């Protein structure tokens, strides 16, 4: 009996080291090899699990406290995960008691803040639990140089992107940034997205926001995401706008710790 695999390799197989995407899987007859088929099913299960994984805002709040930061635990108007998935509109608004809590905070502390940071589970609590604190570490160490005042960080359960608009408006913030779990993909169940808005208020559309996507070690690094976000924030303050009228033209010079990067595979480098 031959030890030779019945699977036929793909000539592009060397490219797989450059991407987690499903390329050059080979074939077994007219179908996929068994290993590739099982890996696909496993990745699909991971993506489904990421959507339904419970959010743990208290753990994030503890992490913020260890960093000397305040965290407010809030909930959207979606009462549970099933409602959240079926009624996106409810995930965009806070529960009335949570909105009242933010109004009271604003009345007690007076005046607005330059920046309100929101962390929400979105469609992948896994992404938030893995990447929110490391990303905040990179971002917050750069903020003092800008001289911006910071509102308490809001931790929102069952939140959608637009919930940051209401939070920013209630806190009187000039800018909002929401860190939220993106819809899981088959090679990325834990991608974190950042959405930035200048002059937030209820009723804004996606055209008023800037998005930085796929923040995770296997995608856009924390340092590069913070670098791009700070550029957008500076330009927004200067031009007093955000969204489609504000383009990401940040310098992309290599950051410390970014590594040497892959070479040109066509030339046999890297």
Curated annotation (Swiss-Prot):
EC number(s) given by UniProt: 4.3.1.7
Pathway as given in its UniProt record: Amine and polyamine degradation; ethanolamine degradation
Keywords of this entry: Bacterial microcompartment, Cobalamin, Cobalt, Lyase
Any GO BP: ethanolamine catabolic process
Residues that coordinate or bind adenosylcob(III)alamin: 161, 182, 211
Enzyme class: lyase
Annotated InterPro entries: EutC, EutC_C, EutC_N
Entry cofactors: adenosylcob(III)alamin
Cofactor info, note text: Binds between the large and small subunits.
Location in the cell: Bacterial microcompartment
Molecular functions (GO terms): cobalamin binding; ethanolamine ammonia-lyase activity
A family per Pfam: EutC
GO (cellular component) term, any one: ethanolamine ammonia-lyase complex
Catalytic activity line of the entry: ethanolamine = acetaldehyde + NH4(+)
Assembly: The basic unit is a heterodimer which dimerizes to form tetramers. The heterotetramers trimerize; 6 large subunits form a core ring with 6 small subunits projecting outwards.
PANTHER family assigned to the protein according to its UniProt record, in alphabetical order: ETHANOLAMINE AMMONIA-LYASE LIGHT CHAIN, ETHANOLAMINE AMMONIA-LYASE SMALL SUBUNIT
Family listed: Belongs to the EutC family.
Function: Catalyzes the deamination of various vicinal amino-alcohols to oxo compounds. Allows this organism to utilize ethanolamine as the sole source of nitrogen and carbon in the presence of external vitamin B12.
UniProt protein name: Ethanolamine ammonia-lyase small subunit
Native organism: Azotobacter vinelandii (strain DJ / ATCC BAA-1303)
Source species taxonomy: Bacteria, Pseudomonadati, Pseudomonadota, Gammaproteobacteria, Pseudomonadales
